[in-house]
Amino acid sequence: MSALPNYFRITALLRTQRYGLAIGLLFMAPSVWAQLPGIVTQPLPNGGQSWTLSVQTLVLLTSLTFLPAALLMMTSFTRIIIVLSLLRNALGTPTAPPNQVLLGLTLFLTFFVMSPVLNRVYDEAYLPFSQDQISMEVAIERGAEPVREFMLRQTRETDLALFTRLAEIPEIQGPEAVPMRVLLPAFVTSELKTAFQIGFTVFIPFLIIDLVVASVLMALGMMMVPPATISLPFKLMLFVLVDGWQLLLGSLAQSFYS
């Protein structure tokens, strides 16, 4: 019983020390606060200004939170992951390949497709910025240009016209004048449409196998046997015989360059 008052006494002492520390920091001398590093800008040789390293680090860490959305919405990731998911459903193997393998394959194929764009971003934006030749604002503009060109090549004109009309933009003078708020949803819509078109083409041969197997089982009176169990080996054999992985992944990569 004697330990209980000691516990409350220690808790009250710690609480008092915390309050005292907070009050001390509040009334700290202004000279102490002045010694802390501030957020300033640095002049560049060409007359521009650049932020201090602390602000650059803060901007970088903040931009990392948007990296998944940028990877999903502004690259080839969306088309590839949808086609591979539809292929898995068409084969009738919902757990093979596993999600981790599917995501890893999609990421590596995305980096392969986007490597020319990433090389341009590195050469035209990051390298001059790291050598203090350009400011961060100019680096962002130069880095966004290759991504814009990639997105414009993959976007249908009908989708651009739709979102231009919804944004109430009167007239766009050339592709370089398309604003990002119009280009992003138009690009995603085009990618979804293209992915489902490729998925439909992938589904057709496996659907034919399912129909043939189901018809044979009904003709033999084996209606209690699930057709998916019988058709799975035939679908796997067909996919292996035509070298399906090479055909599909090669076609996916080529679809971004045609």
From Swiss-Prot:
Membrane-topology descriptor: Multi-pass membrane protein
Native source species: Pectobacterium carotovorum subsp. carotovorum (Erwinia carotovora subsp. carotovora)
Q: Which PANTHER family match?
A: FLAGELLAR BIOSYNTHETIC PROTEIN FLIP
**Keyword Cytoplasm on this protein?**
no
Q: Tell me the protein's name.
A: Flagellar biosynthetic protein FliP
Q: What are the GO cellular component annotations?
A: bacterial-type flagellum basal body; plasma membrane
TM helices/strands, residue ranges: 20-40, 64-87, 98-118, 194-213, 220-242
Family as reported in the entry's similarity comment? Belongs to the FliP/MopC/SpaP family.
- Quick one: which gene encodes this? fliP
Q: Is Acyltransferase a UniProt keyword of this protein?
A: no
**GO terms classed as biological process:** bacterial-type flagellum organization; protein secretion
